[in-house]
Structure formats: C-alpha cells, structure tokens
C-alpha cells in the first residue's frame, strides 16, 4: 500500500498549515506513502487521517477495511473482495442480483463523510484545514442501489454492462451508477456547506476545489 511515497521531510500543505496553528485532517485517498513509512499521512502534516492508503484498494467503494491514522480498521458487514473479481461462473450479466457481492453494506463515501462531520465538530473552536480527497467518481463506478435505480428509471435500461473491467469490478448500469455517484457527492458537499452555515463557520471558511 501507499504507492509513490514522498521523501521524508517533504513540505506539504498539511505541514504548512500545522505551522500556522491549524488542526489538519485528510479524509479520502492517500497514495503517497504507505503505513509504517516516513510518508504516511500523520507524518506528512495531517493530525488526522481516515480513508484509503492505496490506489488499487480504492477501486472498491465497499472495502472490508479503511485506515484511521496508522490503524487498519475493518468494516463489519463488508467482506473482502479481491481486486479483479468477476461475476460468478454462469451468472446472468443482465440480472442485477448477479452483482450483489460487489454492493455490500457500508459505502465508503458515507463512512468518510461521517468522519468529516466529526472532525468539524471537534475543531469548531479552532482553526482547521480539511483535505477531502474524494474517490468519486473514479472506477469502479458504484453507488447505493436505490440511487443507481433512480437514474436507471430516468435514463432507461443500459444494454452494455461492464463484465470485464480490468482492475475494476463488473457493473450492470455504468452510466446510471456514474450519475448516482456524482449526485451522492453533490449531496454530501451540500450537507457540509449547510453544516458550516448552521455552526456559524461558513463565512470564515475558504473552499478550494481542484
């Protein structure tokens, strides 16, 4: 895990903001230094980290674990799914139930968003910087089934499911799933903005989107 590690002592936006007196967090994906190396997030300027520490494992939105600081946290209800897993032999690629094993209990975007709100709550009285490195809408295109079906009903059935996606999992409705992912992220950004307004922090917060 942790491809392309940064050199020890590299100056990052995290270290700069720490020096300026801010509490810092990175929530999402970090692929710049694996666990127990000199380039893991906590050693690169981030007081708190939660998310993926590997580009490849981030291909799944229903992982069986995520990292919280330097601890691997297993997600109860999500089972291990090998990278490059495929539909079961003989499964109907046009039957939505054939894809059940890829869509599990806990959607990683929601787990990360919970940590975002928690970090904001805990640091409301302090200067803080949050880096939200969302994995949306990277492949594998996955979203909660009800949100995908909203777009299937709106856009119609798709005739070309992805059954062999290389490093990514099979997807029955790739276009609808992609749209659902964007909508899901948009809703979470909206929730965060509203939360900051409710807390009286919005006017004193700078948003940088890249």
Regions found by a protein language model. Give the residues of each.
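Formylglycine-dependent sulfatase
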Residues: 1-210
